[in-house]
């Protein structure tokens, strides 16, 4: 199937703004009966589906509150787990291989090269070269630490390692860092910059949740997955560049990033997870690349300022309410358009106006359709 494009002058007499017209040449591999039916009956494909009853404002508000509550409960569970970590930490300190490094105010497991616990009160520290792992809960709740430098010997940061370090403003990562554990930097509210090394391959669930001062995020080249809640409620985050190895974006990964305006998604992503970008109220446009096969439930829920969506016809699996609450989403561009049906049902949900992708209809009929449904911009 091949398509040709014609530019159409704006019709000043009509209120409908027709941006682009595509004419479709029928594919030779289509059954003759199908081609004949469309040729003989050119209006067959312009049937307007029955409009589904709109959800009331009260019902929509209740749905939104339920989704938000689900995300907050998930985050609360991770914080509760961190709160009971002291007992586990005490057991680690009792290990016979753990010694006290008085010079650096640390408990260190010499056998594994793990920094088990930091007990100092300085505002800036450099981790010794002998350390390969920052242990779980090692700096949890430290109230004085503002800056930390990790040597290139460090390959792992375990779960809750720096969570609730409310004074932490800067961390220099090891150039050989491979993984960051669950909730490792949870609620480090003054942490401003995240300069990840190229070696980083895994970021755990909730790792940077509620790091509310981070403004820009460039994810490393070899990261394969953005885990659930990884950057949840990073409220000053404005820009995200998702690198070329990421295959999936997890549940609520960027939910409640209220100031997020720009997201660049690489051509490696196949799944945008449930609530992944929900409540990103400042997001104005998004391009879903052709590699994405699934846009999950509530993926862009409540993105109230989203006006432009570019999405490939290859993206066939758009889940329930994926774009619900995007009440200003008026312009939908279908990339790599062909003669196959493109379901718009989930994109239309919860919006004040309907954008419909029409095929094989003339301009006059398209304008008539647009006037009937109050469409300000129509792509055909």
Regions found by a protein language model. Give the residues of each.
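Charge-dense, low-complexity intrinsically disordered segments
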Residues: 1-62, 72
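Intrinsically disordered, low-complexity cytosolic tails and juxtamembrane linkers
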Residues: 64-67
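Structural signature of tandem-repeat unit edges
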Residues: 71-110, 119-133, 143-156, 166-179, ...
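Hydrophobic residues embedded in beta-strands of well-ordered beta-sheets
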Residues: 113-115
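Consensus positions within tandem repeat domains that build extended binding/scaffold surfaces
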Residues: 136-138, 159-161, 182-184, 204-207, ...
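A structural signal for leucine-rich repeat
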Residues: 347-348
């Amino acid at each position: 199937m091949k398509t040709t494009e014609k530019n159409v002058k704006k019709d000043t007499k009509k209120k409908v703004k027709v941006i682009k017209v595509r004419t479709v040449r029928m594919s030779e591999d289509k059954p003759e009966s199908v081609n004949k039916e469309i040729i003989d009956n050119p209006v067959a494909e312009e049937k307007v589906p029955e409009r589904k009853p709109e959800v009331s404002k009260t019902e929509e508000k209740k749905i939104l509150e339920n989704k938000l509550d689900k995300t907050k409960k998930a985050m609360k569970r991770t914080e509760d787990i961190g709160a009971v970590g002291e007992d586990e930490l005490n057991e680690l300190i009792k290990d016979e291989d753990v010694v006290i490094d008085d010079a650096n105010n640390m408990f260190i497991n010499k056998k594994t090269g793990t920094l088990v616990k930091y007990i100092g009160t300085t505002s800036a520290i450099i981790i010794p070269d002998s350390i390969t792992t920052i242990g779980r809960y090692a700096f949890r709740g430290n109230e004085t630490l503002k800056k930390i430098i990790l040597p290139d010997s460090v390959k792992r940061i375990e779960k809750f390692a720096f969570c609730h370090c409310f004074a932490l403003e800067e961390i220099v990562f090891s150039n050989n860092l491979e993984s960051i554990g669950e909730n490792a930097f949870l609620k480090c509210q003054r942490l401003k910059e995240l300069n990840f090394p190229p070696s980083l391959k895994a970021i755990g669930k909730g790792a940077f949740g509620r790091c509310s001062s981070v403004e820009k995020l460039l994810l490393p080249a070899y990261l394969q997955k953005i885990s659930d809640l990884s950057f949840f409620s990073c409220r000053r985050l404005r820009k995200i560049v998702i690198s070329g190895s990421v295959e999936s974006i997890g549940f609520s990964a960027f939910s409640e990033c209220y100031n997020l305006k720009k997201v660049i998604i690489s051509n490696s992503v196949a799944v945008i997870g449930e609530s992944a970008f929900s409540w990103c109220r400042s997001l104005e446009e998004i391009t879903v690349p052709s590699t994405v096969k699934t846009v999950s439930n509530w993926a862009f829920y409540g993105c109230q300022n989203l006006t432009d969506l570019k999405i490939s016809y290859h993206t066939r699996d758009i889940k329930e309410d994926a774009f619900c609450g995007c009440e200003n989403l008026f312009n939908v561009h279908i990339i790599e358009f062909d003669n196959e049906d493109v379901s718009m049902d989930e994109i239309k949900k919860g919006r004040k106006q309907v954008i419909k992708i029409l095929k094989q209809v003339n301009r006059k009929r398209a304008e008539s359709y647009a006037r009937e449904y109050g469409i300000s911009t129509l792509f055909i």
